[in-house]
Amino acid sequence: MNQGHPQPDMYYSPHYSTPQYGYGYSTNGAPTTAVSTPMPAPQNVLPVPSALSNQGAMQQPGYSNSSNNGAFDTTGQHNPPGMKPRVTATLWEDEGSLCFQVEARGICVARREDNHMINGTKLLNVAGMTRGRRDGILKSEKVRHVVKIGPMHLKGVWIPYDRALDFANKEKITELLFPLFVHNIGALLYHPSNSNRTSQVMAAAERRKHEGLGGQRPAAPNALPSIGQHHPMMPGLPTGGYVPQSLANGPQSLASTPQPLTNGSQPPMPNGGGMLKRGREEEEDLHRPVSNGHDPMSNMHAMSNGYPQQPPLANVHQPPMQNGGDMLKRGRDEDDEVHRSAHTAHDTMNNMPGSMPGLSNAYAQPLPNVHHQPLANGDGGMLKRGRDEDDDVHRSSPNGHDSAGNFEVKRRKTITSNDSMVSPGGFYTLHNGYGQPGVMNGMSPYKRRDDEAETPRPGPNVHDHLNNFDLKRHKTMETSVPAPQYDAMNRPHSSIGTSPTYAPAPVYDNLARPASTVAASPSYPSAPVYDTGARPPSAISAPRRQQSFG
């Protein structure tokens, strides 16, 4: 017993001489060399877990002379004599678990880290069991996990740890599979010689466990989202000449966005800054009227000084607030819709109070590109309601391309009392150079109600198929002859039973009937009655042969 302790220093020196790596096992798994005292637990080889090394030293006396006594380690916690523990670890991506692998007799047997299940198919293959017996044993297991896809060493039937240990003890392959059944098998990986590899494998396992949170990056504390990035009407971020007020002014940054380095009277977006409008603006804003035919996305803001203008959230110079302050209205008020004229749409900037005197001269050119009726009066304000069908009709484009009711809007806009004409590009223009608003003077504000209550008006365009169809249908309904009404209760006596055109049928009385012509008809003579007895002898009875030769 005293001579057993120096042996680990001789066999398991820090240099690990190569002759000690040989496996001294025969084909049946029994050790061929006899050792008086067994080697300590594998923790003496790997000095990291100190508690386990002490436990292995305490278990030495009870495990002495295992080969001579025929004792067999059924726990799988002690390494056989002269055997170095060899274990590898790979990440099983399909299952999201780390797998420890031990090779025995050229077969790789794997054990999972999360639930410690062991591949029973590979374990019984190490025992040299036939396929039929192996499959029969594994099918009888109550707790099993069948893996049919993946790497070859991971396929098979996975069984719990205790059942795998029982099979290994029955087949006498527990020592051959060392250190597969070691409880703290992960500690065998933390060795100074393979610390880099161990750290890489464990880091990969941690990344696999937390891969759901790996793609989320926390935003920078000072990086506020730009309104232009989230709103379809806004242009991109400016490239130069801007001082972000959110960083320069401190806590007041939430009320304003980056502004260009120009005079203080530069107007914000004249349409009321519809930044919180509903989600149909991608569809509507692309078809808003633009007088010069350019891209509507590039003409939404003033570009006189070379800055794509950003709309502020709470700027006091917003023209819609000065022009009536109806930004929080619903937009279905009839009075607002009746007085929604072209003058209001064009003179939004010119009719402002005297706080902004220089706007008429400095921003006269961008107005045709910016003003259109639904946004000029503050109708498309900040706190827009959900879905207003009437407002969708008035916000439609005059060229009739964006919604179902735009054809009627186009037809009614062409019937105007002024001298405006339709440009070849489909946009309505005036002689003063300003863009035509979305709602003209000749258009009724009660468009949807007119469709339900009024007769469709004929348009001057002969090719307006929708108009011609409505007018033709209306004329047909007026000039059609009403169908006759039949009253089953008040109608006159039916002529079916007693019709004057039909004579009554004669009634025949069999008793009082005169002699019928059927019995004795004068037209048909009575048939002669032949009496064969009184008949004179005829030539028929005489033989013809006598008459012929007589």
From Swiss-Prot:
* Bias (Polar residues) ranges: 246-266
Q: Which SMART domains match?
A: KilA-N
Which portions of the sequence form the region Nuclear localization domain?
517-546
Q: Where is the composition biased (Basic and acidic residues)?
A: 385-395
Q: Where in the cell is it found?
A: Nucleus
Query: Which residue numbers delimit the DNA-binding region?
Result: 120-141
Q: Which InterPro entries match?
A: EFG1/Phd1/StuA, HTH_APSES_sf, KilA/APSES_HTH, Tscrpt_reg_HTH_APSES-type
> Quick check: keyword Transcription regulation in the entry?
yes
**Molecular function via GO:** DNA-binding transcription factor activity; sequence-specific DNA binding
SUPFAM superfamilies hit by this protein: DNA-binding domain of Mlu1-box binding protein MBP1
Keyword terms:
Conidiation, DNA-binding, Nucleus, Sporulation, Transcription, Transcription regulation
Q: Report, from the record, the phenotype seen after gene disruption.
A: Lacks conidiophores and produces macroconidia at low frequencies only from intercalary phialides. Produces markedly fewer macroconidia and microconidia in infected plants but does not affect the disease-causing ability.
**Any one Gene Ontology cellular component term annotated for this protein:** nucleus
Region labeled Disordered — which residues? Answer: 246-277, 371-412, 447-467, 527-550
> What region holds the HTH APSES-type domain?
86-192
Looking at the Swiss-Prot or TrEMBL record, what is one Pfam family this protein matches? Answer: KilA-N
Which GO biological process entries does UniProt record here?
A: conidium formation; positive regulation of transcription by RNA polymerase II; sporulation resulting in formation of a cellular spore
| Family matches, as PANTHER family | PROTEIN SOK2-RELATED
Q: Which family does it belong to?
A: Belongs to the EFG1/PHD1/stuA family.
Primary role: Transcription factor that regulates asexual reproduction. Binds the StuA-response elements (StRE) with the consensus sequence 5'-(A/T)CGCG(T/A)N(A/C)-3' at the promoters of target genes. Differentially regulates the development of macroconidia, microconidia, and chlamydospores. Acts as a positive regulator for the development of macroconidia and as a negative regulator for the development of chlamydospores. Involved in microconidium formation specifically in infected plants.
Question: Mind telling me what this protein is named?
Answer: Cell pattern formation-associated protein STUA
Gene giving rise to this polypeptide: STUA
